[in-house]
């Protein structure tokens, strides 16, 4: 989950949020009690997970494009890219070389079109764009058209008025896993 803290889960004592499925996984599997997140925000952390590099090495230390290198600031900012550089190998690229089918479904927020998931080793990209969120999570996901196309959800076929984006993306993820299981091909799902 994006920006999920360890204390947000009921298996760690949180009474506010009920997380039965995650609790079951924690009980039956492994708990990461000493894990380290590369950044407190989404974009740098996602880039670090995909490349294995610290956000500072990638020059990706923020998630807000509007916070990048604006000339009227009194403090000098470090160079900060608004895209995941193609020169860095990603987990998906390495898995692709090993014969995996790679699907990215959901939030990307790692740069413009030339740096979308297909450019980083993913066979499928559903929803991954420059923007961190669609204008709305209710179908048709693009609201009133106020924002540019990159704020929409690409490669997701039309749905119905009652469709909620999280449910649609979950359905696509499940369908992708079922398809890959039928062909007995190893796969990596980045959701």
Set out the residue ranges of the language-model regions.
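Short, solvent-exposed turn/loop segments enriched in Gly/Ser/Thr/Pro and often Arg
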Residues: 11-15, 31-53, 61-67, 104-115, ...
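Polar, surface-exposed loop/tail segments
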Residues: 19-20, 49, 98, 107, ...
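Active-site-proximal N-terminal segment of extracellular/periplasmic enzymes that hydrolyze or transfer
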Residues: 1-30, 97
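Beta-strand elements within well-structured catalytic alpha/beta cores of enzymes
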Residues: 1-5, 24-25, 34, 49-51, ...
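Sec/Tat-exported extracytoplasmic proteins
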Residues: 8, 26-29, 34, 39, ...
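Formylglycine-dependent
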Residues: 60-100, 110-191
């Amino acid at each position: 989950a994006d920006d999920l803290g360890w204390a947000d889960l009921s298996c760690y004592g949180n009474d506010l949020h009920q997380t039965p499925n995650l609790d079951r996984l924690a009980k039956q599997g492994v708990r990461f009690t000493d894990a380290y997140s590369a950044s407190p925000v989404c974009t740098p952390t996602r880039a670090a997970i995909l490349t294995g590099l610290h956000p500072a090495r990638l020059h990706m230390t923020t998630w807000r494009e509007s916070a990048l290198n604006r000339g009227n600031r009194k403090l000098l900012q470090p160079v900060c890219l608004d895209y995941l550089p193609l020169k860095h190998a990603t987990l998906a690229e390495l898995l692709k070389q090993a014969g995996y089918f790679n699907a990215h479904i959901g939030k990307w927020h790692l740069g413009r079109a030339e740096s979308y998931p297909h450019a980083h080793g993913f066979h499928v990209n559903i929803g991954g764009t420059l923007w961190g969120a669609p204008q709305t999570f209710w179908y048709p996901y693009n609201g009133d058209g106020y924002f540019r196309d990159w704020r929409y959800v690409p490669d997701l076929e039309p749905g119905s008025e009652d469709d909620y984006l999280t449910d649609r993306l979950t359905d696509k993820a499940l369908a992708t896993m079922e398809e890959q299981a039928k062909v007995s091909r190893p796969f990596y799902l980045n959701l």
